[in-house]
Amino acid sequence: MAAGAMSSSTLAQIPNVYQVIDPLAIDTSSTSTKRLLDEPVPHIGSITSRSYLLRVKCSSPEDCHAFFFGLATEASGNMSQHGAEYIARSMNEKLYTGRSADELCHTPFSHATILDSLDDNYTLNIEGLCYHCHCENKFSHECWKAAFIAGEKMALLCKDLRMYCH
């Protein structure tokens, strides 16, 4: 089995994704990319106490900004962590094919989690994907366009997984 490949029984355990939710902009430019690997990034513009775990695996020293895409599954199911990790890895592998070695970022996709602390005793975790970029004009028209294209590609991959793996 190729690196990053999963067995058909493991693929069957990934919940069906029926919709990739439109991107949510996350301004991380004041945070180093290294810190984005496993530390929650707080979000101050939210009604609840919200933070993001973006798990960016980029080796670029440049600041980045990100978009969170929720993955809507069946009403009775939730996206699993290994499912989101698999989808992110697959997206990066598809993107890497045909790219030159000197391009800025080879891993713009990662498994991400929204952490909503609804009260002291309960945190809601929403699993999804992060798409990050290093463009100079963060959240410009071109940047948003790239994010929506990324979302469309995620939706196509999720459709393929639904059709051929379940």
Swiss-Prot record:
Q: Which GO terms describe its cellular component?
A: host cell nuclear matrix; viral tegument
Per its UniProt record, what Pfam families does this chain match? Herpes_UL55 (PF04537)
**One biological process term in Gene Ontology:** viral life cycle
> Which InterPro entries did the record assign?
Herpes_UL55 (IPR007622)
Its domain of life reads Viruses
**According to its UniProt record, where is this protein located?**
Virion tegument; Host nucleus matrix
Is-annotated flag, keyword Phosphoprotein? no
Question: What keywords does the record list, in alphabetical order?
Answer: Host nucleus, Virion, Virion tegument
Q: Which family does it belong to?
A: Belongs to the alphaherpesvirinae HHV-1 UL55 family.
What is the name listed in the Swiss-Prot or TrEMBL entry for this protein? Tegument protein UL55 homolog
UniProt source species: Gallid herpesvirus 2 (strain Chicken/Md5/ATCC VR-987) (GaHV-2)
